[in-house]
């Protein structure tokens, strides 16, 4: 081929691959039947593009049909994931591999097929085939019969297959219907991310962001497929579903709680069924007789008027992170007919009362009588190709709790995995739950409002049992169409009455609209937008570590900043405006000459910027959700840890800034502030601040006594900067209670604002350290490092990094008690770390210690 004269890339229109091939994909064995349930994930699922199939669904779903040239399918998973998992396409997350994935091939209907057997004795009165999520629509067939259709990415499918399942081999076939309005690929480059969203919004509920946004590339196929669980359930004549337990406390007293429990029951028989519905929350039990006409479905409610035992004494309340423990009770509903279990549902209950007001046109949230301050971030997806499972959600949400976050936002509602809600319940992270409407500028109103409303009704019932649900929101940065808005208000009122609904994420009683680019740290304290309201989106680029850059970029694309960087969201223009990030690094620390130097200097900016992002909200403490706290693919912007679960410096800055009781410097006023978000009352605290020259000599210091009440900010010391300070100097502050440090902070400041290049004059420091590594009884690993600076020079941006003792490769994820910290001469610090054995690759971990001026 001849290189194009204009220097552009080649366009490959056709390729033929010959040879014996390499690895052959093998299906994963499905788990055995358990408690009336057979999981059909894994197993014998196969997949084929619909254009390659001439048979009907009735034919495909028979044992005699012989699939030819079908591939092994990943279920649950998207169509694209199946092709990636068999090696048919390159990993679209790496470098610019996304350009090698065909848009036209994956814009198609696809067929899934699975053969399974039902164990003898499994079948009771009724047998159901269940789908927890497909995209976009699906026709479902079993043993030669069409069962029905599922429409919308968040609608469950449940089909009565009692009379269709046979002994021996059974076959299910699913025709996945592609989106009607796929839109165009976003062309990201070093300058621009292209425009956000597009016509795919017409098909909502779907995975709208897969059309491409400034934080995610265009996903080929738009995540069509069987993306959530498929399973068989066997029950008696009556089923139970979608439980809800609400709590009312005699506030401000929290020593008792009045519970109301409800569940939906349905009779699948052709005759009236009489039975007993039994319920249990913790040690409290209750029951009532229920009569259901043929085919009848209804909600059965238990309240304290008829069941006085539902007044719980001394409940262990569910609290968000920083307010208390997220206590959960085991709960159950069981329907019995003639003392035989027809169906049962186990779930978890958090005893908590959410209340809300919109006084003065400002939304305020309260939990168990205390004002709730939402601090956290927006999530777009768990993973861009929907590859997260329970393990990944648990890690990510645990990271959020470790950062002292209290809330996450399910932006535009595109995460539908039960495992997210379960993890938030366990870790005490409240959820701001959006519905599937992006900014009106980023896509049209849904063309199929009835489908949208049906999905919304089903989805609210599905998630309503979770204590972590804190708020529902109709639309991102806009208002839903009137038909949908009215329907959403009705649905919440009928099905989840104790949770508040707002129409818009960024207007009316809340605030939003950024900014999204990097600003000098001080400027966040002077932003007026949304200062008096809960602000739903504000962020800045957050550059990954050099180790993760090596995992993300090709050797030729890692430096200088070019189109591969743009493909991974680091663009000069657009909302992230990474030009300002580059300028702040260059002015503050000098122009980086390599990707490694850039990544290391970027951690300074990551830390200072994100600390200011949250510390600047101290005036009114109305809450902030950063844009974004979680990245769903290898991105160079808007995250706290990266796609590989590597925390950046921003993670630890946020962890500090979001402490329930916190001491901080307000650079706009030079006040030292003690901020109490959720720590209760603390009397007689001692605040101490020192201004130090670059050689660590004390230029000025002062102490003050502070009484701090919850939900307050107290100014306690006015900083002074004496003459003859070194050009770059430090501010160190501590907050102590009974001699114990409860919060500390360390800043660097310059007489020439934002220019810290004199730091490069600091001598290299040899730190003293001692580390112990232990394997715990539960199979996890723990390490403790004690680091001491015995020199006369400050040691800055000290980073601990756990790697394998044999292969020297990072172990991820790892929880660090602190990182990217500084030690003055004579200071010593203990850092605790933990990780899972399954992530070690057979290595015992060791801890590497580096830093800005550390040898």
Where are the regions that the model predicts?
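Short, solvent-exposed loop/turn segments at secondary-structure junctions
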Residues: 4-6, 52, 135-136, 179, ...
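Substrate-binding clefts and catalytic carboxylate motifs of secreted carbohydrate-active enzymes
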Residues: 37-40, 46-55, 74-78, 211, ...
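Aromatic, loop-rich ligand-recognition surfaces of beta-strand-rich domains
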Residues: 1-27
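Substrate-binding/catalytic cleft of secreted carbohydrate-active enzymes
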Residues: 407-573, 602-605, 609-613, 623, ...
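Secreted/periplasmic carbohydrate-active enzymes, especially glycoside hydrolases
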Residues: 26-407, 411, 646, 652-855
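Flexible loop residues that form catalytic
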Residues: 4, 15, 20, 50, ...
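Non-catalytic positions within long, well-ordered alpha-helices that form the structural scaffold/packing
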Residues: 398-401, 425, 617-618
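A generic secondary-structure signal for well-formed alpha-helical elements
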Residues: 19-23, 49, 120, 176-180, ...
């Amino acid at each position: 081929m001849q290189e194009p004269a204009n220097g552009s890339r080649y366009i490959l229109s056709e390729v033929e691959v010959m040879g014996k091939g390499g690895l052959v994909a093998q299906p994963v064995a499905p788990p055995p039947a358990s408690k009336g349930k057979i999981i059909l994930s894994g197993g014998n699922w196969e997949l084929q593009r619909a254009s390659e199939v001439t048979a009907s669904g009735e034919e495909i779903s028979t044992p005699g049909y012989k699939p030819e040239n079908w591939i092994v399918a990943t279920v649950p998973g998207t169509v694209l994931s199946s092709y990636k998992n068999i090696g048919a396409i390159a990993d679209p997350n790496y470098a610019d591999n996304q350009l090698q994935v065909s848009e036209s091939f994956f814009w198609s209907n696809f067929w899934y097929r699975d053969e399974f057997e039902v164990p003898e004795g499994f079948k009771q009165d009724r047998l159901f085939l269940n789908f927890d999520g497909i995209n976009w629509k699906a026709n479902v067939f079993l043993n030669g019969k069409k069962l029905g259709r599922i429409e919308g990415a968040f609608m469950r499918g449940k089909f009565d297959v009692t009379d269709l399942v046979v002994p021996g081999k059974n076959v299910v076939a699913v025709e996945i219907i592609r989106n009607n309005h796929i839109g165009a690929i976003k062309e990201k480059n070093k300058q621009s991310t292209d425009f956000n969203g597009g016509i795919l919004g017409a098909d909502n509920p779907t995975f709208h962001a897969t059309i491409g946004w400034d934080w995610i590339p265009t996903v080929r196929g738009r995540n069509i497929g069987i993306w959530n669980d498929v399973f068989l359930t066997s029950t008696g004549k009556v089923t139970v579903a979608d439980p809800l337990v609400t709590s009312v406390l005699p506030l401000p007293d929290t020593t008792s709680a009045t519970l109301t429990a409800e569940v939906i029951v349905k009779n699948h028989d052709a005759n009236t069924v009489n039975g007993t519905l039994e319920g249990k929350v913790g040690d409290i039990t209750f029951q009532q007789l229920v009569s259901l006409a043929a085919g009848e479905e209804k909600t059965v409610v238990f309240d304290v008027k008829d069941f006085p035992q539902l007044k719980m004494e001394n409940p262990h309340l569910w609290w968000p992170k920083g307010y208390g423990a997220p206590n959960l009770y085991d709960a159950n509903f069981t329907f019995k007919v003639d003392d035989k279990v027809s169906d049962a549902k186990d779930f978890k209950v958090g005893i908590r009362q959410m209340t809300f007001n919109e006084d003065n046109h400002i939304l305020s949230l309260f939990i168990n009588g205390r004002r709730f301050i939402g601090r956290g971030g927006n999530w777009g997806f768990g993973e861009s190709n929907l590859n997260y499972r329970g393990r990944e959600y648990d890690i990510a949400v645990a990271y959020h709790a470790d950062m002292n976050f209290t809330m996450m936002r399910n932006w535009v509602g595109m995460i539908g995995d039960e495992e997210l809600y379960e993890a938030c319940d366990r870790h005490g992270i409240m959820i701001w739950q959006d519905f599937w409407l992006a900014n009106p500028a980023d896509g049209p109103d849904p063309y199929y409002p009835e489908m949208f409303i049906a999905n919304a009704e089903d989805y609210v019932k599905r998630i309503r049992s979770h204590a972590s649900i804190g708020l529902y929101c109709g639309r991102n940065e806009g208002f839903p169409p009137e038909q949908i808005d009215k329907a959403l208000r009705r649905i919440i009122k009928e099905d989840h009455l104790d949770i508040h609904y707002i129409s818009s994420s960024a207007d009316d009683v809340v605030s939003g609209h950024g900014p999204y680019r990097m600003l000098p740290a001080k400027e966040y304290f002077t932003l007026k937008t949304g200062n008096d309201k809960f602000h739903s989106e504000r962020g800045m680029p957050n550059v990954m570590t050099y180790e993760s850059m090596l995992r993300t970029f090709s050797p030729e694309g890692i430096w200088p900043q070019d189109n591969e960087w743009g493909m991974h969201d680091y663009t000069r223009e657009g909302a992230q405006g990474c030009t300002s990030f580059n300028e702040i690094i260059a002015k503050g620390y000098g122009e980086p000459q390599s990707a490694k130097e850039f990544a290391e200097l970027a951690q300074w900016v990551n830390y200072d910027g994100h600390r200011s992002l949250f510390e600047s909200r101290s005036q009114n403490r109305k809450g902030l959700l950063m844009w974004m706290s979680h990245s769903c693919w290898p991105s160079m912007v808007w995250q706290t840890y990266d796609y590989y679960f590597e925390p950046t410096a921003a993670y630890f800055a946020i962890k500090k800034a979001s402490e329930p009781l916190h001491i901080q410097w307000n650079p706009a006023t030079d006040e030292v502030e003690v901020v109490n978000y959720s720590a209760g009352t603390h009397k007689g605290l001692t605040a101490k601040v020192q201004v130090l020259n670059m050689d660590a000599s004390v230029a000025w210091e002062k102490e003050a006594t502070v009484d701090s009440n919850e939900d307050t900010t107290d100014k306690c010391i006015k900083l002074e900067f004496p003459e003859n300070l070194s050009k770059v100097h430090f501010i160190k502050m501590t907050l102590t209670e009974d001699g114990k440090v409860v919060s500390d902070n360390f800043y660097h400041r310059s007489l020439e604002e934002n220019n810290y290049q004199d730091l490069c004059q600091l001598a290299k420091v040899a730190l003293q350290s001692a580390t112990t590594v232990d394997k715990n009884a539960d199979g996890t690993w723990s390490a403790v490092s004690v680091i001491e600076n015995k020199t006369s020079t400050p040691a800055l941006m000290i980073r601990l990094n756990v790697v394998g003792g044999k292969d020297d490769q990072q172990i991820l994820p790892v929880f660090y008690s602190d990182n990217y910290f500084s030690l003055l001469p004579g200071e010593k610090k203990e850092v605790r770390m933990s990780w899972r054995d399954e992530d070690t690759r057979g290595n015992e971990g060791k801890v590497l210690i580096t830093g800005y001026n550390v040898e």
